Amino acid sequence: TMRDLFDVVGLLNGDFPFVHENGSEHSYLETIQKAKNLAGFLAKKGIKPGDSVGICMQNCTEWIIAYLGIAAHGATCVPLNSWLRGDELRYGVEHSELKLLFVDEKRYQYTQDLDVLQVIKTNSTTDALTFDDVFKTESANWPEENATDEDVSVLLYTSGSTGLPKGVMLTHLSVVNAILGFYTLGELRGLVKGETLLAVDNAKTLLNIPLFHVTGLITIFLLSTLAKRQIVIMNKWDASDALNMIQNMKITNISGVPTQSWDLLNHPKVDDFDLSSLIDIGAGGA
């Protein structure tokens, strides 16, 4: 299960710089401890393995912690497209039968009337629960109950380009296999072609894809746990910001869609940046 993976990563890799967002850093074990607190919070709220718990936020540290806690608790994580509004968002919440929703303040204006318990990232306007309330739930270990490897770990929604979005069910085993597959591919390229893609000191990847997308979730975020790689969060895509972050944070890996690669290559000042830290650039999709 995902919980097993998170624990094995801690045993194999120990502690390492894991999440960086706007100058704030969290180590892997620190992040996992916050995830354990969040899992304990879910248990106190009556969330059981197999229940659906949603996340509707822009990329942020709390998004990562929420996913780790939900997955390790054995609940089904439902990453909702944070660009949705109105009826589209209501459809996702109702169709997935959410028991609880983690949301940021910007999205809360569209979700506050929905019939689901909500936790807000920051909260200056209401009496709703916040992440501060979540992290006050101290849990030294994961809750006793857990999922099985064939239970649904994450429910990702399609874009709905030909109709209503469809929920794609990924089991714990399928997600773990995907992570191990990507990691093994990187190792094999090192053995066969002499290319170093993952096993480098101070590896850092730019999180420039929304976490509600499979690329951001699995090939950037979750692969980084096994690869002992720091995730440098972009809250919103901007080519100038990306070039600055690659240079200043010494990013080693970046993935994305072809339009992002085009943005970087055709930036009017791309030659002014030191991008020598990059060892791997990937792009796919539309």
Model-derived features: positions:
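ANL superfamily adenylate-forming
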Residues: 107-149, 164, 176, 267-268
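Conserved pre-ATP/AMP-binding loop-to-beta segment of ANL
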Residues: 140-157, 164, 195-204
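Conserved AMP-binding/adenylate-forming core of the ANL superfamily
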Residues: 2, 17-60, 64-68, 85-90
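Conserved AMP-binding A3 loop
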Residues: 27-29, 153-181
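Adenylate-forming
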Residues: 58, 103-110, 209, 237-238, ...
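A short helix-loop-beta submotif of the ANL/AMP-binding
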Residues: 52, 58-78, 82-86, 94-100, ...
